[in-house]
Curated annotation (Swiss-Prot):
Gene3D superfamilies: DD-peptidase/beta-lactamase superfamily
GO molecular function terms listed in the Swiss-Prot or TrEMBL record: glutaminase activity
One protein family per Pfam: Glutaminase
Keywords, sorted A to Z: Hydrolase
Name used for this protein in its record: Glutaminase
Signal peptide: none
Family stated for the protein in its record: Belongs to the glutaminase family.
EC number: 3.5.1.2
InterPro entries: Beta-lactam/transpept-like, Glutaminase
Enzyme class: hydrolase
GO process terms (BP): glutamate biosynthetic process; glutamine catabolic process
Length: 325
């Protein structure tokens, strides 16, 4: 799908105007492997053959192919947006509460920064639980309403929570509860552990599609202004900080390899989605449920690299190199 009239649109404003996304998607059809996440039943039941891609450009045009309208829970792809909302609602003080350094640990490691008791960065579970707790609201209900409204502003449309997913995330998220209690014991988390996990679980359960997620990425890529609505969602500084941490930490302990190969700030998720934000260029989302050992979509990573190569999106120029042993 391409917005009407985009073929004649100025390529400087619409870098994807001549890109054949159907061809790009088909080129990755044989890039299989990986396993669908089974941490909750709703993810385990996902059709592994689903695949979609969507782009949103600074002038608000949407390009999409494949299963770009398929709805799924946003899962960890919500983390850069939670960080942005926390930064906005605390006037930047969230940077004192959570680190911004990469970690070689697993995304759900029961570990905090030595000496500070802070989560290492907002892209791991501990960091996202903490940033969700920093979003404005004196009660859990107020906080979760603010999170949903904020995510909807990033998307440019009203979003909904999959209540079944939210319930499963809370009931089966023992490690997240452990992280929250650890942060409480360190004096880092200032709401109850149960409320912190509940806010994060509901954020992960928000329903999106590749097209919606691409619009959210585009809002960060456009300096905090939603290109579909024209509304400012967060400041340029907040958008910059969120995208910066996506670049260094968004694919967990594979972030260095990702930036070498793809060169675009991104956040992976166990739903099989990857959201990308290429500053000043576009927002994108790729979706394919089977994951590698680090929880990143196998086919999605291939699509992201080919997209970056074709549009020259690599932050450091050129195209991504082959993976080396």
């Amino acid at each position: 799908m391409t917005a009407p009239g985009s073929a004649s649109h100025d390529a400087a404003h619409d870098p994807a105007h001549a890109l054949d996304l159907d061809r790009l998607l088909a080129s990755a059809a044989d890039d299989g492997g990986g396993q669908v996440d089974d941490s909750i039943p709703q993810l385990a039941e996902t059709d592994p053959s689903l695949a979609g891609i969507a782009l949103v450009t600074p002038d608000g045009r949407t390009h999409a192919a494949g299963d770009s309208a398929h709805a799924f829970s946003i899962q960890s792809a919500v983390k850069p947006f939670l960080f942005a909302l926390a930064l906005a609602d605390t006037d930047g003080a969230a940077l004192d509460a959570v680190g911004i350094e990469p970690t070689g640990e697993a995304f759900d490691a029961i570990k905090l920064e030595s000496g500070t008791g802070r989560p290492p960065n907002p892209m791991v579970n501990a960091g996202a639980i903490l940033t969700a707790s920093l979003v404005r609201g004196s009660t859990l209900e107020e906080r979760t309403a603010r999170i949903l409204a904020g995510l909807s502003a990033f998307a440019g449309r009203d979003l909904e929570v999959d209540e079944d997913v939210a319930e499963c995330e809370q009931l089966l998220g023992d490690r997240n509860h452990a992280l929250a209690h650890l942060m409480r014991s360190e004096g880092t988390l200032h709401v109850s552990a149960d409320d912190a996990v509940a806010a994060y679980a509901r954020a992960c359960a928000v329903l999106v599609t590749p097209e919606i997620l691409a619009a959210m990425g585009a809002t960060l890529a456009c300096g905090g202004r939603n290109p579909l609505t024209g509304s400012r969602v967060v400041s340029r500084e907040v958008a910059r900080d969120s995208v910066s941490v996506m670049a260094t930490c968004g694919v967990y302990d594979g972030s260095g390899r990702w930036m070498r190969r793809v060169g675009v700030p991104a956040k992976s998720s166990v739903s099989g989605a990857i959201v990308l934000a290429s500053p000043g260029r576009l927002g994108a989302a790729v979706f394919s449920p089977p994951l590698d050992d680090q929880g990143t979509s196998v086919r999605g990573a291939v699509l992201a690299q080919r997209l970056a190569d074709e549009l020259g999106l690599h932050a450091f120029g050129g195209t991504g190199g082959r993976e080396r042993a």
